[in-house]
Amino acid sequence: DEIHFADGGVYRHAIGYGHFMETLLEAFPNEKDALSAYCSLLAKVGSLISPEVLRSGRFSAGGFDYMSMSAYDEIAKLTSDERLLNVLAGGLFQNAGHSRKTSLYEYAMVNHSNIEGAHSFVGDTQHVADAFVDVIKSNGGDVFTGSEVTALSVAGDRLETVTVNGKDEIIADNVISTIHPAATVSLLDNNSIIRKSYINRIKTLENSLGAFTAYLLLKPGVLRRSACNFYLYDTPSVWSAYDDSGNGEIHTMLMCHQNNGKSEYADVVALLIPMSYSHVSKWADTRTGRRGEEYEGFKAATAEKMLSFAGGFF
């Protein structure tokens, strides 16, 4: 990854802890101890999601301690260099992190995976979804598309049935929901398990930000594909770059060149900015392709702002 600041500063997050540290030492030669401690901390927390731990099917007990720690506070203990502190937060876009909100566990899991993993997929990510489906089916499972869970029926102290599309019922020993907690509890029928006070609290919690994405389709041979992702910031304070002002201003952006595996040139560039749901909530009850001229105008205007923002860095 490359972290770009409006003052011209460019810093790199390399793959592999050794390379990661060596690369940042070129920009911060006096921060060797801080970077060493940082890498050790990330690797320690990241070990909690090792394949061995995941195969056990249990959450590592040590992870709970890191969930109650502030990522910003713990990293700030390692260095007094403000620019380094913000460079280490360069990839916060992936979880819209913030100095007041992001836990060390959340931060470390994302950044450890980035350092130890690949920077992009060859082609699109559909083959990852296909691989998941293959694993599920090879273990006797089924995957249903075009299906919406419309009710979760409670009997006594357990969830008894899951209703799909308002008619089909599924009975299971365990049910896992990965949609918004407030949306999950709204599906409960005859709820006698979860207290009303908890449900009310879940519904009033501040939501995290989503991402607005603009895809640029390029003419062949125009732009050489870069082997990295670009994080662009017009503010020196990355840790607060994701405050939603509500005025539509852009302060940070993620830019990616899709690796099609066929050419050294990019055919698609993706531009992503963080966005609060409040900006699009007026179209909540509409369907794709039927949201009207106002929505199309909103998309076009936002895309133009994004192009202008990105153009200021290259």
Regions found by a protein language model. Give the residues of each.
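C-terminal segments that line or cap access tunnels to active or ligand-binding sites in enzymes
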Residues: 220-314
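Residues forming anionic-ligand binding surfaces in small-molecule and nucleic-acid pockets
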Residues: 102-113, 274-276, 283-285
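Glycine- and acidic
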Residues: 90, 112-120, 211, 284-295
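Helical element adjacent to the flavin cofactor pocket in flavoenzyme catalytic cores
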Residues: 107-165, 170
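Mid-domain catalytic core of redox enzymes
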Residues: 150-264
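Surface-exposed helix-capping loop/turn segments at secondary-structure junctions
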Residues: 51-56, 137-143, 224, 311-314
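Rossmann-like flavin
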Residues: 6-102
